[in-house]
Amino acid sequence: MKIALSGKSGCGNTTVSSMIAKHYGLEFINYTFHDIARERNIPFSEFYEKEIIGRDDYYWDRYLDKRLFALSKKNNTVLASRLAIWISKSADLKIYLYAKMEVRAERIMTREGGMYSDVLSSTFNRDENDKKRYLAIYNIDIDDYSSETDLVIDVTNINSNEVFELIRDEIDKRNLKN
């Protein structure tokens, strides 16, 4: 079974994907810019500003997505990334998580700290930068996900356990097996 899960920052992509992987005994694949920054011993904010926003050759996007594309070919996986539903063409189930920006900012603030107004602003800016980059690199509009998904879940008012249950119900309904 192969599952691809996408959504913007603060929607619970990583949390829910890891829950699915653990429950079904699947490999959890989630390689992000945070991981690259950590590997390079650079704070994420500095890496993002200098290496993602500050470059116009999209080197790190291509590096990350090439790695994710190769990993997406493996079986018995849950791939969690902004572009997972577009990258993993052979996924048995493609899921997109959605939440209002204000809720995502609250969740990010809880996870990472900071002042709400700053987190809200940076969340908005990151969304805009992501959209611009993915359009430029791949001609993918990350706000136009409906044709790429089997299941869209608005997570604005539900927690990760409830999201997991909805996904588990869909997996059972489709009779997907590991």
Swiss-Prot record:
Entry's Gene Ontology molecular function annotations: ATP binding; CMP kinase activity; dCMP kinase activity
- Annotated coiled-coil positions are none
A GO CC annotation given for this chain = cytoplasm
- The signal peptide here is none
Q: What is its EC number?
A: 2.7.4.25
Q: Name one GO biological process term.
A: pyrimidine nucleotide metabolic process
For this chain, the annotated S-S bridges are: none
Q: Which residues bind ATP?
A: 7-15
Task: Give the UniProt subcellular location, in the record's own words.
Answer: Cytoplasm
| Catalytic function, reaction form | CMP + ATP = CDP + ADP; dCMP + ATP = dCDP + ADP
Fetch the InterPro entries from UniProt: Cyt_kin_arch, Cytidylate_kinase_dom, P-loop_NTPase
Keywords in alphabetical order, please.
ATP-binding, Cytoplasm, Kinase, Nucleotide-binding, Transferase
> Which EC class is the enzyme in?
transferase
Instruction: Report which superkingdom the organism of origin falls in.
Output: Bacteria
Similarity remark: Belongs to the cytidylate kinase family. Type 2 subfamily.
In Swiss-Prot or TrEMBL terms, this protein is called Cytidylate kinase 2
Q: Which organism is it from?
A: Borreliella afzelii (strain PKo)
The primary gene name is cmk2
